[in-house]
A protein has these predicted regions:
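Extended, charged alpha-helical "arm"/coiled-coil substrate-binding scaffolds
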Residues: 1-152
Length: 152
């Protein structure tokens, strides 16, 4: 059962990635692009600090430029827009239980870490993005795609 679940998750991820390649965004909401860029940059700054490097050293070591970070931020906005569209069309709603489940799975908190929803949300916002619910909706859509795609 666990193996089948992991296989379905992998299928959901694959279908999601293929789907995103086919999606074209006509116009990005300006505020969303700016916030996604700030979130992406902050995330890199957190990792840089943890690794004892400056932000510039860290992204340089990854072979990334500021333009790459903007492109990655645009991809995140596209993913959120796509997930919201699929959720509306398919009647999917992110329940509080699913939200918490996806958030915990994403963050993989340490044993001694505070695992309350409020603490996990705070950590996600500090380390990842200001849009934890939107990002966990992506996980719900991936799960849905994995469960509902036809295996070849």
């Amino acid at each position: 059962a666990k193996e089948e679940k992991e296989n379905r998750e992998g299928i959901g991820d694959t279908v999601w990635e293929d789907l995103l390649k086919e999606c074209n965004v006509k116009k990005y909401p300006a505020g969303s692009r700016k916030q996604a860029y700030k979130d992406q940059k902050r995330s890199y700054q957190v990792f840089a600090k943890v690794s004892g490097q400056s932000y510039e050293e860290f992204i340089g070591a990854l072979g990334q430029t500021d333009e790459d970070i903007q492109s990655s931020a645009d991809d995140q906005v596209k993913a959120r827009m796509t997930a919201k569209t699929i959720a509306i069309k398919e009647g999917l709603t992110l329940s509080d239980a699913d939200y918490e489940r996806f958030l915990l799975a994403f963050l993989e908190p340490e044993e001694e870490e505070d695992k309350t929803l409020k603490a996990m949300e705070k950590r996600y916002i500090e380390e990842q993005s200001c849009y934890p619910r939107d990002d966990m909706l992506i996980e719900l859509v991936k799960e849905y795609l994995g469960k509902n795609s036809k295996m070849k």
